[in-house]
Amino acid sequence: MAGHDVQYGKHRTRRSFSRIKEVLDLPNLIEIQTDSFKAFLDHGLKEVFEDVLPISNFTDTMELEFVGYEIKEPKYTLEEARIHDASYSAPIFVTFRLINKETGEIKTQEVFFGDFPIMTEMGTFIINGGERIIVSQLVRSPGVYFNDKVDKNGKVGYGSTVIPNRGAWLELESDSKDITYTRIDRTRKIPFTTLVRALGFSGDDEIFDIFGDSELVRNTVEKDIHKNPMDSRTDEALKEIYERLRPGEPKTAESSRSLLVARFFDPRRYDLAAVGRYKINKKLNVKTRLLNQTIAEPLVDPETGEILVEAGTIMTRSVIESIESHLDGDLNKIVYIPNDAAVVTEPVVLQKFKVVAPTDPDRVVTIIGNANPDDKVRTVTPADILAEMSYFLNLAEGLGRVDDIDHLGNRRIRAVGELLANQVRLELSRMERNVRERMSVQDNEVLTPQQIINIRPVTAAVKEFFGSSQLSQFMDQHNPLSELSHKRRLSALGPGGLTRDRAGYEVRDVHYTHYGRMCPIETPEGPNIGLINNLSSYGHLNKYGFVQTPYRKVDRETGVVTNEIVWLTADEEDEYTVAQANSRLNEDGTFAEKIVMGRHQGVNQEYPANIVDYMDVSPKQVVAVATACIPFLENDDSNRALMGANMQRQAVPLINPQAPYVGTGMEYQAAHDSGAAVIAQYDGKVTYADADKVEVRREDGSLDVYHIQKFRRSNSGTAYNQRTLVKVGDVVEKGDFIADGPSMENGEMALGQNPIVAYMTWEGYNFEDAVIMSERLVKDDVYTSVHLEEYESETRDTKLGPEEITREIPNVGEDALKDLDEMGIIRIGAEVKEGDILVGKVTPKGEKDLSAEERLLHAIFGDKSREVRDTSLRVPHGADGVVRDVKIFTRVNGDELQSGVNMLVRVYIAQKRKIKVGDKMAGRHGNKGVVSRIVPVEDMPYLPDGTPVDIMLNPLGVPSRMNIGQVMELHLGMAARTLGIHIATPVFDGASSEDLWSTVKEAGMDSDAKTILYDGRTGEPFDNRVSVGVMYMIKLHHMVDDKLHARSVGPYSTVTQQPLGGKAQFGGQRFGEMEVWALEAYGASNVLQEILTYKSDDINGRLKAYEAITKGKPIPKPGVPESFRVLVKELQSLGLDMRVLDEDDQEVELRDLDEGMDEDVIHVDDLEKAREKAAQEAKAAFEAEEAEKATKAEATEEAAEQE
């Protein structure tokens, strides 16, 4: 027997064909969401407050300080928030301290700071009753970047940019004359020496002393001449910079100084963030820049005077490691003192080394490091600017290297916590000005923190972020895998990211640093390809937001691959050579071969085993979760694998799903971490279990109650249904499955079914990827799914009185009311079809002048005789089913409703959808197709033992698509079915062809794994042997029921008066330009005329035609299409005098063209206007009558008084 048995959870054993020992379990798959939000609550929010506060008033007599904050209990539970369309959020209270510096008085107060949405355990947020996910964003990291460009003469020039988290950019560039310029905040360029002089190093000799003598420096100094002898060089430089930044304003050195300080050295205006400081120190540090260079002068320990490194030594990694403590300390440190007129007058500390130029052994080049400013320094420093200039000048000498902006060392991830923190920080800094003003204006004696803080903008910003940010998305809840994938999604779009139109080919492409960090397969097809990615299965974020992936460390001395796990970011990995996970190892853990396949800086080739530093932990660390669920992925073309991974996310949960016979072993982990199953939180023993709840008694005696969800509507309209897996008496451990979620079976992901599939054509019905299916799959509910739709009706107060929910609906027979209760609401369990009333509702009509008799009737019978319109909620087209639930919300019950709404009724209708012709099916290898015919079981081809085949696929769909994995799955699946086992064949480490054939042989199948099939209609065998087996097939969310649509009479667009388009708007089919050409080609003038008039936008014409048809009269001539009038109006709005002339060149008023029409044909809007007018008249008459009554009454009173 090939393979070995592996236990997945407590309910499933699979025979696994993997050969590689897994040394590291998969991390929790949704930790990217949960860890980030936890960090935000633990310290992120505190840091945001500390960044903005304390705030002082303009006279510095008052100060507002931040003390701390507390998050209280949420107002609603999770379930209540879902039901009431509320947000699952908790109130946050912040403690502030207000200090009066004149009197020394301190007021401390707790201020309510709004409700903050709280993340659920599943990594989602409930916002207004809907489950949402904040997608992590992939952005360019702050730091310093160097690039090269070739001009039209083939000359290489370099550029450099310092990009902060927020603040002004600082750029360097050289031109064709070898002069170096700098740009501040994208303005006009100035020689870089001007900026150096402004920093306080004004003399030419000082500049040569700092940077050394090079052609670029010399040319720039010559260009940068002293123009005004009245000013010092520093003042002149400052004025020149000011002129670039604020052209047209009077320039002084002082104003320039304060402007530069604000632009670069003020922490409130310029922020590198921790990650920016880390990246700058890493790039400008001398350690990385000295690597493999020849030192030109001896390195001497400044304390002892001993020579650490002789001149002429090549600085290899081992040499640098030996003096690392000195390089991090004071070795070759030089302090430069800027002159008094400089922007920043503090001493500038640099590290300065001289090395031999790589291009010319006789030249010496100066390398300047920024001497590693402290991590807490979040602004750029003069040392950073000088070190950046030095790196830039070194590039021309062949030292250093340019950056690749698509490298994952230069792109980082902003997860939920950081995105939220940025939003809050933005609003707090806006609030700061407001607070300052209030502190200055109001009376200091009575001022309290509560009075000066306005929380409205902050709460509004948080609300807006969750409600309408591009990164806050409605959760994709088709099935648990799609939920999981959505939580692990990384998007390069969104605020501060890229836009679809600007993103080029390079950004979207797979980069070598994606290995183990981002999946090279799973990305959408279409305009977002490569911009939206998925985290790889082992990917993990470090504190700076860079993606790390785990490797096994190789002991260089002994050559043993240890089980020590090291997590590396992309730029750390560049320094090492990494062997693949499938490299063979000896018993003692050393490499079995002298040469192994490995990677170094993106080069995949064979490397000697003795230079390997690390080894992959698992073959599946390259791919994402959905991709890791595709068996035999290694045998599929990547384009088809992409479709396979994406289509698994569109699978519809079935009534009784089956886990695949041929899995990858990933199904258990994906189901466990998806959040759709019920997982035990503690060890214990089951004391009660039914379909609604499970009770588990812990060892300490406390009781855990787990509620099981039954047929809840998911975001995608599928049934979210959980099934209890445990029974009374079972012992459960923490992390065990208590109940399966939707699309799960025995604790494993089960997106589809295991039908018997044959690759053969049948009467041409599987032409072009179509799928032929046996009726058994319909009758036995194999591919039946339940769909729930939600409909709501609300009653509002109108001008003419309140709307009412009632059984008494005008002009409706008793038959239509048979399933409504006494309130007029449908009963649960009623079967409804389109057009049936779900909620009976009437709206008051405008009442005309009432006669005395009518007023009498009103007085006797109350509202019965009042004029009302029927505005009931009815079942829309194609939505028939069974009423699953009804929810009623009223103000009386304390439900929060929108203003003006008195009552809200929600009706849930469940539909049981069997598979039918037109539904889309797919395998896991990108082999998708539409069901073209459902054949009776007796007509389907059958196997020699009499088993009929379930599905027939076209064999021509395989060779050109190159997804051979489906054929391997087919054969192995048949063997698994025959042997009665489940199989795991992990990606890149699955069953080899030897394993496959030995399993086929073990199952007693023929050696070619094919079989003879018999025609079900004739009983004759088919000519050739056919590949028949078991393939995992899923039903996708693209169902024909949702797409079928027809219109006869329906709504029209307001402006053009043409019929709307699309099923959602109940629109028509567009008869476009090309279709009109077709009619013109046939000369079908009458058809053409009615297509362009009655059936489109001739308003009067279509009303007349409708009337003529109903009354049996001849159809009148059409009028002028509305779109023609729209065109005329548009031309007139552009100032063109557009008129219509008749045969006698007399101007025709456009509305004259429609004269001769019957006056009784009225535009819909006219009807509304007439109604409104009638209502207003009725109201006016009523008011007049009331006034008359009042005057009469007054007159009577007066008369009485006089008597």
UniProtKB/Swiss-Prot annotation:
Residues 1177-1195 have a biased composition (Basic and acidic residues). Disulfide bonds: none annotated. The RNAP catalytic core consists of 2 alpha, 1 beta, 1 beta' and 1 omega subunit. When a sigma factor is associated with the core the holoenzyme is formed, which can initiate transcription. PANTHER family: DNA-DIRECTED RNA POLYMERASE I SUBUNIT 2 (PTHR20856). DNA-dependent RNA polymerase catalyzes the transcription of DNA into RNA using the four ribonucleoside triphosphates as substrates. Belongs to the RNA polymerase beta chain family. NCBIfam families: PRK00405.1, rpoB. This is DNA-directed RNA polymerase subunit beta. It comes from Streptococcus pneumoniae (strain Hungary19A-6).
